[in-house]
């Protein structure tokens, strides 16, 4: 029974986390209450990113005192998010080395995209609501000694990647969906909200109304950018538990590309050559190369 249940959970887990918004222009939609909701996470409040143009006086002087006050408040909130316990990424690094090759190999010439952080959070939630051998297997994959350690590590990962200051939006949204045919412990739902910043819902699996709630949740968390993909996401009536994790990321380049330097060129793909626009920029930067690919670092603000 446990093996069958885990197969059902993982099948929907992998389908759900494939809906990922890596870059975005729209803003996340406002949350709406749902009759199905069991617990709702509270995201950190952040001071807004300082806009220098708002501190220029009519006579041309710059209000440095006012700017510094806003800047210091913003910097304190950013530091609060990024200053996580030393070594919290150790287990995450081990997980990434184990998982990424499995996710990105064997594409038969097709491009692949994945967000290992989303899968990490989904697996962490799954460990929270399972026990026995299933939990031990997940903890081993994630490199965590026990659930208490996993809670601390997952919360640190989530907070280190969270930002919502008006200039950068980076939100990992997580959720758990339960069948109304099974019982649950409210303290477990509260733990998901507290440590994994996850919403939890309970309803009739396979019903149009519950599917619509899932689709709406995906849309709200991704600024409506995945409306088409989310509209086809449904849960089978025999499903007991489903997990969904999205990432909404929006930021500016540290140095924007000049449109005048964008020119058509040849892109060499496995399927053949094609002509497309290439953004070009000159400068000193970090460059990585290997036998099979090369990459360049491009910082964001």
Residue ranges: model-predicted function:
Residues 50-53, 109-110, 114, 119, ...:
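Non-catalytic, conformational "gating/processing" segments within enzyme and secreted inhibitor domains
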Residues 3-5, 10, 25-204:
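Detector for small/aliphatic-rich hydrophobic stretches
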Residues 10-17:
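Sec-dependent signal peptide hydrophobic core
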Residues 18-22:
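Hydrophobic core
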